[in-house]
């Protein structure tokens, strides 16, 4: 209990800013936001860190993962590689500014994920349907519409 309280207290500092920096630093050091997220999942499942505190860590991890692309782009010749790496970075930073910076939008991703998780626990087929829709059907429809 003391460990859980301590971790949540540290991650909750600065309105989530400390958690974002921690997520970014972990991801930069391991060069993978997937590893950072994979570390957090069992902690959330065990109740060691609250979902509200894990959320800004994952946001920081998403920014941290752009460092790898920026480093690779700096090694390339020409400006195209750096341009797209900066677009990737700014996309993630602007996502934080919009979703985390506007207080009434901040809980939206967690609420949506909690709703989807509750549905998936009751009916796995809904989770599979959501994944297929988001990653296959919707992209194919967008491609077909804008061809």
Task: Please tell me what each predicted stretch does.
Residues 25-93:
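Membrane-interfacial helix-loop connectors
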Residues 71-147:
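Juxtamembrane and boundary regions of transmembrane helices in multi-pass small-molecule transporters
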């Amino acid at each position: 209990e003391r460990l859980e309280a301590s971790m949540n207290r540290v991650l909750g500092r600065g309105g989530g800013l400390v958690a974002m920096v921690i997520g970014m630093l972990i991801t930069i050091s391991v060069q993978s936001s997937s590893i950072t997220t994979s570390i957090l999942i069992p902690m959330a499942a065990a109740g060691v860190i609250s979902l509200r505190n894990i959320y800004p860590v994952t946001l920081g991890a998403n920014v941290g993962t752009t460092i790898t692309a920026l480093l690779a782009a700096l090694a390339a010749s020409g400006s195209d590689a750096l341009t797209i790496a900066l677009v990737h970075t700014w996309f993630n930073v602007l996502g934080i500014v919009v979703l985390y910076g506007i207080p009434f939008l901040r809980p939206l991703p967690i609420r949506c994920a909690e709703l989807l998780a509750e549905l998936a626990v009751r009916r796995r087929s809904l989770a599979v349907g959501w994944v297929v829709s988001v990653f296959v059907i919707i992209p194919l429809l967008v491609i077909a519409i804008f061809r």
